[in-house]
Amino acid sequence: MDKKLHFVSPETGPNSNLDLTPQLAQSSSAFLFEPKNIVPFETALGWQKNFQKNLIEQPFSPQAVWLLEHFSCFTMGRGSDKKNLLFEENNSPLPVFSIERGGEVTHHMPGQIVGYLVLNLSLHKKDLSWYLRELEQVLIDVLDLLGMEGKRVDGLTGVWCEDKKVGSIGIGCKRWVTQHGFSLNVDCDLIGFEKIIPCGLDKVKVGKLSDWIPGIKVCDVTPLLRESVKRRFKLNWEK
């Protein structure tokens, strides 16, 4: 990416006319899943598909949120450019999954929190741009609680700290029921990002929270994400 990134604060930039406070008229229910063990990517994808199918068929059934970690892998969104893989497809260093979300190639690994949200936007707001900004705000709010300033970049999706991208967003949506969500780098090994052009952004710098807060762990951040998701989308966790 040759041009200089134009950072914007959460309240400014091209989306400054958006109300970034939760938009639900009333709360709705969701199951919360926080697996203790690392989850294979294809397993979590199956969970999401099942819940999405059920929500499409039964729109007022509980939604679902997962906060988890994955084994190391790469995922590619709809229409991803294979030129962003810096290796031969038949000689991949890690599993590669092509999935139905927006965005380019990204990398998942232990030490990164992945948030998957299967929400019925008919109960929230039927606006994908709004939804993307809300997911960004979930991460920005958590960073604020940690004493860090999360930033957006003009024309891009995700969250940066200083000049490093720490949070990625990628969603899928079918009949206004969402899939996929966000990832936040906490204390992960970032070496896998050297094998790709992350999110299709040439020369982008990738960071993790432990660059600023040494010793921080996933278990420190997960409760903050849980509450941020709950507050932003006005969710009641199902027992």
From Swiss-Prot:
Belongs to the LipB family. The record marks 165 as: Lowers pKa of active site Cys. The gene is lipB. The lineage of its organism: Bacteria, Bacillati, Cyanobacteriota, Cyanophyceae, Synechococcales. Catalyzes the transfer of endogenously produced octanoic acid from octanoyl-acyl-carrier-protein onto the lipoyl domains of lipoate-dependent enzymes. Lipoyl-ACP can also act as a substrate although octanoyl-ACP is likely to be the physiological substrate. It is found in: Cytoplasm. The active site is at residue 199. Residues 59-239 form the BPL/LPL catalytic domain. This is Octanoyltransferase.
